[in-house]
């Protein structure tokens, strides 16, 4: 008996928990935040697990308390307490006692209707800051000075407050909570008692502590107690001396302020009492509602009891009718016996025939009743089998539809995978095209190098021609040397800029390598863009160097032409001067022969000095040209070394990137193949599991049908045995009747006196046999009905349990398949979005590179024009170039920041839009269908429970 009672308690607690879970579902779905929904789902799962709740009655009660508290908080719309965090592993902790306050809270709709302003003033005061509280207390104390004099009413209100607090502490205890009708008289008794109230601080603290209902460390206990003193010194201070007036007045004001604060506290407690009265009224309403529900249940129970009584009465009426029929049959039999007594002497054979007919009729009625019972039994079994077949057909149709949908989704996914592979092949083709373009650019670079060598050879020839120039080129050579130094500085600065650019590009490439590991397609596009940028920069540098060398060669040629023209002019001038001097000499020879000798000597000395000076200048020019050639050869070798090193670095970086790309492609293909294999394997396993389950169910149904058939055959055998026994008894009775008749004939012939005694004995024996037959037939009927009812109950329970198991398994499989489909859809959508984003980024970067290339072209053209026009403005042009470079850097930084912000926005949109609208709609449809199935099963379970209760009541 104790085990049965424990099982009933477990069933009641489980049913209560199921109701709580069903009531929670709409509120959980209405929660706005996804994290709260996930947390509620984790808590519900934790409560549904037997390992987390415990197996005993206390564990189930604790689980139900958690479920009730969660439902209450969901109805209220705010999660608090333990539900703000995820559930801890292990068993659930026991809820503390103060959590019962949540269950005692009134309905939010009633609370809103009761207070017109939504919240009382004391709640708003508790929420505001302490300074605002002080200001309000000052205002209220200044506006209500007239009410401070009425101290007895305040004392009485405090007495009411203390009494009310005691009543609340008693009413909220678990022992007195059921006696909801006895709350009001206790309150009246407390109001009638008026005891003197002390104004000590300890008394106030004790009352507040007694009013504390499980709330740990409330606000009014954290505040410091206010000292209370009487107002009697007010009158005595007015009669004191003037020396202490100010001091006493300040004390009086302080005491008045203390009294005002205490009066405000009293008002505050009165408002709390009013709210407590409202709360008690709400509690009383809840109790009335519960009592009404109990009365409704009682009325339902009484109606059911009345129905059962009516059925019992009907059955009793049927029994009475059967008894009457039996009495009528007995009367008819008695009449027949009397007739037989009368006609016994005339026709014993006719009497025997009548008895045989009656026995045949009784046996036929019994057989008809048995046949009807068998028909009912078979019909019930057929109905159960039809229901199970219909449900199985429905489940099979749903499973076929789901398999078709999954196959369709798999085909779509395969098509999308093929599209992605095609796009990858297109990207590979583009990469090959870029490699071809790179080879063409390298050829162009070699051609330009050969042209540069030719230009260098021409420059060497020009330098050789310069050796034959005269002393007049000293100034031009100095100018050329200054220009050459400036050009070398420019080249060094450009080389430093190119090296810094190369280092910055290497750092950017390293960062891009890190990003390539995360995203494969983005890394390919970035690599292509970086290669294009490097090639463009390399071309720009080549064109710039070409332009510089051509400009220098042109300048040298122009300077050589100018020098040749100047020398020719000077030679022509010298020739003219010599002619004039010769003419003068011929003229003066006649006049000054003596002076001629002196002039010849002076001329010879002058010639010697000129030759010496020319030789010195020529030697200095040769030394300077040799130094210039050595510097040029050094700069050439350094540039060649730097270009070779740069090319080697580029080749190493390209090889690394190509290896990384190949590895990433191989990993991507392996992951694709692995995922496809896993998907196919899971699909095959699911199909096999479904087929196995269907076969198992068919086998179970066949076994159940075989069991039912065997039971029916056993019942038939039993019925046949009973019928055979009855026929044997009837045959025995017939033989006994024949023997009795023969004995009667003999006795009539032999003994006429003993006829009456023998007749009486025969009638008595016949009645006893008939009564025995009737009792046995009634017992057999009752036993057959009981066995039939038990078998129907067992078959119903088995079918329901099997159907529940099948439904649970199919729901689990549906959830798994839906999860797999959702994951595949998310991966496909993410791949699509990444591909589109990569294409957009590539197009944008190409546009940016083109714009940069055009801007750089324009700037280089302008710089070259300015250099050709004005040599003096070189410094200004260089400063302008520096400013342009700074602007470019700022522009690049802004572009990089914009790209970073754009990538962040794209990833945020990715993360936000992971779940498409179609998937959400499908999930909502599945949730609604599951809800309808759950409601249908609940209704079915309630109907079966009612049938069981009615059957138990009949038994």
Curated annotation (Swiss-Prot):
Superkingdom, natural source: Eukaryota
Gene Ontology biological process terms from the UniProt entry: receptor localization to synapse
Record flagged with keyword Signal: no
UniProt KW Chloroplast keyword: no
Keywords noted in UniProt: Coiled coil, Cytoplasm, Cytoskeleton, Disease variant
Subcellular location: Cytoplasm, Cytoskeleton, Microtubule organizing center, Centrosome
Stretches of the chain forming a coiled coil according to its record: 277-954
GO CC list: centrosome; cytoplasm; inhibitory synapse; plasma membrane
Major subcellular site: cytoplasm
Pfam families per record: DUF4485
InterPro entries with a match to the protein in the record: CEP112 (IPR055310), DUF4485 (IPR027831)
Disorder named in the UniProt entry: Spermatogenic failure 44: An autosomal recessive infertility disorder caused by spermatogenesis defects and characterized by the presence of acephalic spermatozoa in the semen of affected individuals.
Family matches, as PANTHER family: CENTROSOMAL PROTEIN OF 112 KDA
Name this polypeptide is given: Centrosomal protein of 112 kDa
Species assigned in the record: Homo sapiens (Human)
